[in-house]
A protein has these predicted regions:
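Conserved GNAT acetyl-CoA-binding A-motif
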Residues: 8-10, 188-190
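Post-signal peptide N-terminal segment of secreted/secretory-pathway proteins
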Residues: 80-93, 103
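Core segments of cupin and vicinal oxygen chelate
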Residues: 2, 13-68, 192-251
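Low-complexity, glycine/alanine/valine/leucine- and proline-rich hydrophobic stretches
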Residues: 260-263, 269-282
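Extended catalytic-interface subdomain
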Residues: 61-77, 95
Length: 325
């Protein structure tokens, strides 16, 4: 296999002038600076394909320690390549969003209700309750709810799904820090959306070394009302999805979607230098081109933290970052 653990970083791009504001946001979720580095515009162009001076801060949550997964990298550019994915719907080609768990979804929703309310390009989903069993059993005093409660918040700075489990647990899939204001975990899973009717996880299994996660085998979905509300789907809009993990790693998972309906293609807004969530990274055994059959736009060099790294485009059009260990 190539990856040494689950998904390492969620990479967010911002203008350099927004650094302190975004550090404060992530600090509220328990992500604190762990390392800082920089690249010149020339070196950033060579590795990331965007020619602007770059300073990056790697942010760590206490839950990252278990498997070196779920960190945040804040890339602060002198000039952005574009305005990114913003609050576009979840299921568009090229979409990304970050998932994390919480022990208090209501506290998060209360604080998100008016957060950044001065901007138009924002979306806070309703609070969605998704029973684990299908068909769902009746919820009574003697038979409490068992499932997930979820709310998604998208704006130009980022796209995050906050999820609370009820009545069950998945040990190791997100490590919640109950000392934090929002009692949340590190980033537990990442999401990508392939082109319509083009579901294919073979590349991620064969080249990344990922495998289908327990309870996450490939299946069709979209006809359940909670899923429709969470993902802003219309009746009849179905999709295929699979959850992938690094072997023996219970967190840092990758969820791969492909709609059965036509969607806009936003892959151009989903790459380094675009505002907001613009990339994901994995730690790997080798960043050599030989380890990456089938990719395009391969670039290699030292990243802003002085680590051996490469970037490339997967066959589904997604940009990825690998870091050598």
């Amino acid at each position: 296999m190539s990856v040494v653990s689950g998904l390492h970083e969620f990479v967010f791009s911002a203008h350099a002038s927004e650094r302190e504001r975004l550090l404060a946001f992530w600090s509220g979720l328990g992500f604190e600076p762990d390392a800082e580095g920089a690249l010149s515009a020339t070196d950033a162009e060579a590795l990331y394909g965007h020619g602007a001076a770059l300073t990056s801060i790697r942010l760590r949550h206490s839950g990252c320690a278990a498997h070196e997964t779920g960190l945040v990298r804040l890339q602060c550019w002198d000039d952005l390549a574009g305005e990114g994915l913003g609050a576009h719907k979840p299921l568009v080609t090229g979409s990304r969003w970050m998932g994390m768990y919480t022990a208090d979804i209501l506290e998060l929703r209360d604080s998100l209700s008016d957060f950044n309310s001065h901007i138009d390009d924002r979306w806070l989903s309703e609070l969605v309750s998704a029973p684990l069993a299908n068909p769902p059993p009746a919820v009574t005093w003697d038979s409490p709810f068992v499932g997930l409660r979820e709310t998604l918040y998208f704006d130009p700075d980022g796209r995050v799904a906050f999820i609370q489990r009820g009545g069950f647990d998945r040990p190791g899939f997100g490590t919640i820090d109950t000392s934090l204001p929002y009692k949340n975990s590190e980033g537990s899973h990442a999401n990508v959306v392939q082109a319509s009717r083009s579901f294919d996880t073979d590349f991620y299994k064969r080249v990344f070394g990922l495998e289908s996660a327990p309870y996450g085998e490939a299946h069709d979905s979209g006809d359940e009302p909670p899923t429709q509300r969470a993902l802003r789907l219309e009746a009849g809009q179905l999709f295929r999805v699979e959850r992938l993990r690094a072997p023996e790693c219970p967190t840092g998972l990758l969820q791969v979607y492909s709609p059965y309906f036509d969607t806009d293609d936003h892959r151009i807004f989903s790459q380094p230098g675009q505002r907001g969530l613009s990339a994901y990274s994995y730690r790997v055994q080798s960043v050599d081109a030989a380890a990456l059959p089938g990719v395009t736009d391969y670039r290699a060099g030292q990243n802003e933290f002085g680590e051996p790294a490469c970037t490339f485009r997967a066959p589904d059009g997604y940009s990825w970052m690998w870091i050598g260990v």
